[in-house]
Amino acid sequence: MTAISNHIDTIIKLNPDYTQMDAVYLTNKLLNLIGDAALELPGDTDPLTNLDLMVKAAQDNGKIPDSQAARQILEAQLMDFATPTPSRINQLFWDKYQAGPRVATDWFFALSRANNYIQTRAIAKNVVFPAKTEYGDLEITINLSKPEKDPKDIAAAAHATQSGYPACALCLQTEGYAGRTDFAARTNHRVIRFLLGGKTWGFQYSPYAYFNEHAIFLDAIHEPMVIDQSTFSNLLNIVTMFPTYFVGSNADLPIVGGSMLAHEHYQGGRHTFPMAKAPIETQVEISGHPHVFAGIVKWPMSVIRLVSADSDELINAAEHVRQVWNQYTDETVDVRAFVDGKPHHTVTPIARRVGTEFQLDLVLRDNQTSAQYPDGIFHPHQDVQHIKKENIGLIEVMGRAILPARLKSELAEVQKYLLGEANTMKPMHQAWADQLKAKYDWTPANAEIQMQAAVGRVFARVLEDAGVFKRDEVGQKAFARFCRAL
């Protein structure tokens, strides 16, 4: 079989708008993209390997330049044929939804993987391991999935005219966008539309997923992130619509928010995070909401969990907690709602269904900085920034570390140092490595497992740094004072 015929089989399998009658038409469409010389190109039975063969043929035939961006743009164009149009996708999704939410999401997720929108091969490169801590098993990942920028693309982007379209990577306008040297190819990207709070929203998957069925729910309008009562309502409506998914929002302030504050969106998926498994350690009363169970979660960050079968009462209770926190100051533990009139408090909310009840976790956030902690008082402190210095966003709040790609090679050098081997360990790891060397015995047999455990302990410390009420006696008494204010 040829690469062309194999790809046509993939197209017909995934896209109901095409049949075998369209084979000649599709052959010509594909040849237009990869060159007539590829007509008899031998194929591969694996669709993604077959895709690689066609992209290489296009490069060999002079149809695309030798650059990463050009290859990715062509990959998306070739897989676009295998992807139904947005209107057809939406019709098929909501038809399947009638048989159950899970039926619809399973189908859309499988299609998003099969058409290479979800970059399964890149995601498989990530390093993932558990780490035992006093808070349960945390999840550590070293993110290797996002490709390094091609120097040719960086140079080309520097000379490219900026159109401002699409406004950002989350905008609905990315659906079907061809891509360019400085903007990802999205020809094969599709978004499910739905109504949320009387407005049009979109539901899609993340192309570089950080966990199972990593979904993004986005406002159809490009407007900034905000946390208010409508956020809690939206989150509970989403878990009502998709009960097998959790959903949460990043905070709406810099330092404690995510990397994309410019576009209102939430993230969810079918994954049980460590924080969801963490127990309540102290029950709390929320004034005026007797039917809402509330408690402090045993977690390195400061989390209040609200539980009720009544979503409206839960929304009102959450808004009460948010409003009290947004005005709350306790100078004894450096917690300040305002400094020079500027607000510093918000929450990171996470919703899930547990049987007939709704759970809403509210993680208290404070984005102050100080002379001692210029990156953030409640942000990873300098002594752990050799492992993690980026913002602690929604996914990490829940106990899954997203660590930078540099650590794969850097930790290997630390391990060599600990084993007394020749190494090129970076100076920023020296103090930590010396502590590890003094405290533990290192052998080739135990080095990897001990290194993973050590990274896990650092991540737990990172989360403790981000916690507004510390886990010591002073911090827990301060947390109790806040809870009495509720």
Swiss-Prot record:
An example Gene Ontology molecular-function term: UDP-glucose:hexose-1-phosphate uridylyltransferase activity
GO cellular component: cytoplasm
Keywords: Carbohydrate metabolism, Cytoplasm, Galactose metabolism, Nucleotidyltransferase, Transferase
Pathway the protein acts in: Carbohydrate metabolism; galactose metabolism
Broad class of where this protein is predominantly found: cytoplasm
Reactions catalysed, as given in the entry: alpha-D-galactose 1-phosphate + UDP-alpha-D-glucose = alpha-D-glucose 1-phosphate + UDP-alpha-D-galactose
Top-level taxonomic group: Bacteria
InterPro entries named among the record's database cross-references: GalP_uridyl_Trfase_II, GalP_uridyl_Trfase_II_CS, GalP_Utransf_C, GalP_Utransf_N
Pfam families named in the record: GalP_UDP_tr_C, GalP_UDP_transf
Localisation per UniProt entry: Cytoplasm
GO biological process, one term: galactose metabolic process
NCBIfam families: galT_2, PRK05270.1-3, PRK05270.2-2
Similarity comment text for this entry: Belongs to the galactose-1-phosphate uridylyltransferase type 2 family.
Protein's name in the database: Galactose-1-phosphate uridylyltransferase
Organism: Lacticaseibacillus paracasei (strain ATCC 334 / BCRC 17002 / CCUG 31169 / CIP 107868 / KCTC 3260 / NRRL B-441)
